[in-house]
Amino acid sequence: MARAKSRVKTITQVKSEQPCSNKRQALSQLKRIKWNIDFRSENQHHFWKTIDTNDITFCAGPAGCGKTFLSVYYALQMLAQKKYESIILTKPLVEAGGEKLGFLPGDVEEKTAPFMMSFYYNMEQIIGKQRLGILKDTNTIQVIPLAFMRGITLSNKFVILDEAQNATTEQIKMFVTRIGEHSKYIITGDLDQSDIQKHKSGLNDAIKRFAGVHG
């Protein structure tokens, strides 16, 4: 898994010396983080370069290969550089064959929080819990369930779809057509951990369809 050089030490110093209480302070402190990545494999480096040069990137790989960490690290770095207005996090919330949030208590964010822990854990390691909380509270980092994307055009956003192996072909098609002006998409998943049949996986279908396509 990829790690930022001296990542824990750098974040601990920034976090302890400069507590923040608002979005402006949080974003200002992001600029002071040393954004250096130590790639652990050529595949990780290739993934990073692909994100850098394309508006939409698909990545399939096993758990622990660093795809989620690299995705959120890149997104947070771009946010620190003010390249995008905000970060959108999404997953297909598969439960017994479909997205069923209605029976869970709380609002949408509370319902989806257990599904988004992989995002939050990695982001906390990079920018600290306090800054993450402020950026979430101000919708600078926002969670939108994949099923709720229909009809939304996402402009000036950095969007990460994880666990995409559980999205159907129709959901992936709907998702990629939501991209607006000056936005970047990363779509990741593990085809060996799909909760739906592999031939129905939108990620599997998209990788086959878009193999060799750049842009």
Q: Language model features by range: what are they?
A:
Residues 2-13, 22-36, 42-161, 165-215:
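Conserved helicase motor core of SF1/SF2 NTP-dependent helicases
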